[in-house]
From Swiss-Prot:
Gene: purQ
Keyword Ligase carried by entry: yes
Role of this protein: Part of the phosphoribosylformylglycinamidine synthase complex involved in the purines biosynthetic pathway. Catalyzes the ATP-dependent conversion of formylglycinamide ribonucleotide (FGAR) and glutamine to yield formylglycinamidine ribonucleotide (FGAM) and glutamate. The FGAM synthase complex is composed of three subunits. PurQ produces an ammonia molecule by converting glutamine to glutamate. PurL transfers the ammonia molecule to FGAR to form FGAM in an ATP-dependent manner.
Protein's name in the database: Phosphoribosylformylglycinamidine synthase subunit PurQ
Ranges for domain Glutamine amidotransferase type-1: 2-226
Pathway(s) this gene product operates in, as recorded in its UniProt entry: Purine metabolism; IMP biosynthesis via de novo pathway; 5-amino-1-(5-phospho-D-ribosyl)imidazole from N(2)-formyl-N(1)-(5-phospho-D-ribosyl)glycinamide: step 1/2
Top-level taxon of the source organism: Bacteria
One example GO MF annotation: phosphoribosylformylglycinamidine synthase activity
Length: 227
């Protein structure tokens, strides 16, 4: 399986993502610069964390207009896996692949620590190797990770089982309904604020994030067999 790691000016978690895929997962991964216009030959797209375009205007607002984004939209429309982590999640809301928005943390401070997450939906292509309700430990590192949506959107997310991860015990940023990660209605686009790529090795704190990437590979292999 081959992953595309999209790089924007200001991305700073792209190396972590590449390392997680190549060295921990054992799959292929390549950087794709934001000015490129093709994702031919790739099976999954990863939008890493960081501060794309310096977070000017607002997080993800300028990245929305990058040359690669129409291809990311087309990729998602084809049903292929798209994962946005932290700034990547913010970008996914800006381009309309996911509902809602990410706003300033309610304490107005940058948060960097490992937090407990509850797996709220273990039936997606990103979570099938987790148990429903399982508590995992994954790092967060953000200043604008407070997920917000209106009441109608929140009701729809709940009814469609689109809430994939929630903060357990303590909500670090004020997100509505403790939301840490959501998928689109089709289930092939996941946005999350915590960093699974930073939880793939025991030596640096645990491997709870690795199963997310392993789930994607498993789903992809099953699709190839059934194609």
């Amino acid at each position: 399986m081959k992953f595309a790691v999209i790089q924007f000016p200001g991305s700073n978690c792209d190396l972590d993502m590449l390392h997680a895929i190549r060295d921990s997962l054992g799959e292929e991964a390549e950087y794709i610069w934001h000015a490129e216009t093709s994702l031919a030959g790739f099976d999954a797209v990863l939008l890493p964390g960081g501060f794309s375009y310096g977070d000017y205007l607002r997080t993800g607002a300028i990245a929305k207009f990058s040359s690669i984004m129409p291809e990311v939209l087309r990729f998602a429309e084809m049903g292929k896996p798209v994962l946005g982590v932290c700034n990547g999640f913010q970008i996914l809301t800006e381009i309309g692949l996911l509902p809602g928005a990410l706003i300033r943390n309610n304490n107005l401070h940058f948060i960097c620590k490992t937090v407990p997450l509850r797996v709220a939906n273990a039936s997606t292509m990103f979570t099938e190797l987790y148990e429903e309700g399982e508590i995992i430990q994954v790092p967060v590192a953000h200043g604008e990770g407070n997920y917000y949506c209106d009441d109608e959107t929140l009701l729809k997310l709940k009814e469609n089982n689109q809430i994939v991860f929630t903060y357990d015990s303590v909500n670090p940023n004020g997100s509505r309904a403790d939301i840490a990660g959501i998928v689109n209605e089709r289930g092939n686009v996941l946005g999350m604020m915590p960093h699974p790529e930073r939880a793939v090795e025991e030596i640096i704190g645990g491997t709870d994030g690795l199963r997310l990437f392993e789930s994607v590979v498993k789903a992809w292999k099953e699709e190839q067999v059934n194609a």
